[in-house]
Amino acid sequence: YMAKRILVTGAGGFIGGFIVAEALKRGYETWAAVRRTTNREFLQDERIHFIELDFTDELALKATLAQAIADNGGKWDYVVHNLGATKAANYLDFERINYGYMRLLVDTLKALDAVPEVFLLMSSLSVMGVGDDEGYTPFKITDDPVPNTRYGMSKAKAENYLKMVPGFPYTIFRCTGVYGPHERDYFLMMKSIASGFDFSVGFRKQMLTFIYVKDLATAVINALEAGPKRRAYFI
């Protein structure tokens, strides 16, 4: 039995660390793509293989990936692209990072003949745009995305690129609000609610959805093992 090999980009992030942990738990040979500056506080397991990928340098990225593939007996079985910007100083950064970096990774894997069994893109519910604030009907996966933020637009553009690559083995997760250990923003919100503050944005009823980070990490690995679906899922 050969252990499955997985590459997780954005491994130093909140969600990335939990995806790495779940992959290790299942016995995968687990590669964490990081930058030189990435905080590795939650990537302490000595079984992790680190690979420094510089998405701002196309040639260096290709060389690093090619070297890793050559040195380690072949391509990755699974790639989880969890790298993304949710906050950006300049709105152009959203497209450069969320669309541009993913496209570069896909194109490079193709060029190296290293397309995995499954490429899972961590996208976002924000590709859908504004919800129905009259009847509060939930989004259906068949609804057309109408993103209304630069962030949502950049994620939608990344999704569309995957769909256009002939036969590319992708699955897309449109993640909702993710909470859990090491996450700051929702934690502060929950603390204030717990201490008796109720707050909402605006004056309308709000329907928000959340997923616990460890459940999300489990779902990510399950989705890889289920094979490429060439479609998106809300999670």
Task: Tell me what each language-model feature is.
Residues 6-26:
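N-terminal Rossmann NAD(P)H-binding glycine-rich loop of SDR-like oxidoreductase domains
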Residues 9, 33, 79-83, 119-125, ...:
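SDR active-site strand-loop-helix element
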Residues 33-38, 55:
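N-terminal Rossmann-fold cofactor-binding loop
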Residues 53-104, 130:
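NAD(P)H-binding glycine-rich loop region in Rossmannoid oxidoreductase-like domains
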Residues 103-150, 171:
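Conserved Rossmann-fold NAD(P)-dependent oxidoreductase catalytic core, especially the SDR/UDP-sugar
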Residues 128, 171-188:
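Flexible, glycine-rich beta-alpha linker
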Residues 132-177, 198-206:
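Catalytic helix-loop patch of NAD(P)-dependent Rossmann-fold dehydrogenases
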Residues 190-198, 207-235:
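Alpha-helical substrate-binding/gating segment
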